[in-house]
A protein has these predicted regions:
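Conserved mixed alpha/beta catalytic, RNA-binding, or beta-rich assembly cores of soluble enzyme
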Residues: 1, 6-9
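Active-site loops and adjacent core secondary-structure elements that bind or stabilize anionic groups
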Residues: 107-115
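Catalytic-face loop-and-helix region of soluble metabolic enzyme cores
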Residues: 9-102, 107
Length: 115
């Protein structure tokens, strides 16, 4: 099972991590919900979510709600909608990656560099 939780302070993530380890042996991890938060606010929330329990994020409205409203009002065309949704998603991916600890690479070129 997975816990789906909104953004919160690091101390709350740590408390949730301890609680899940103690009482929910079937939990595979937690994912952060977007809950229509602005992109920058959600990215700031990623930085707080450093507990090992946190595995990723599930977003929807954060990515498409604003651009969709602009499209429905006729303020942007189809291409503009697609571009804005894609840009929001790319910003969230970059924000997530920037908030995670650096991991060792296992890419073939990295392995060759060690030889």
């Amino acid at each position: 099972e997975w816990w789906k939780v909104g953004t919160m302070a690091a101390r709350h993530w740590d408390a949730l991590d301890a609680l899940v380890r103690e009482r929910d042996p079937y939990c595979r991890g937690a994912v952060i919900l977007g809950l229509s938060q602005p992109v920058e606010q959600l990215i700031a929330g990623f930085a707080e979510a450093r507990a090992p329990l946190v595995k990723g994020f599930m977003i929807g409205r954060t990515v498409w709600a604003g651009p969709s409203l602009a499209w429905l009002k006729g303020e942007i065309d189809d291409a503009g909608l697609q571009a804005q949704v894609a840009a929001n998603f790319r910003r969230l991916i970059a924000g997530w990656r920037d908030s995670r600890p650096a991991r060792a690479t296992t890419a073939p070129e990295a392995a060759g560099a060690l030889a």
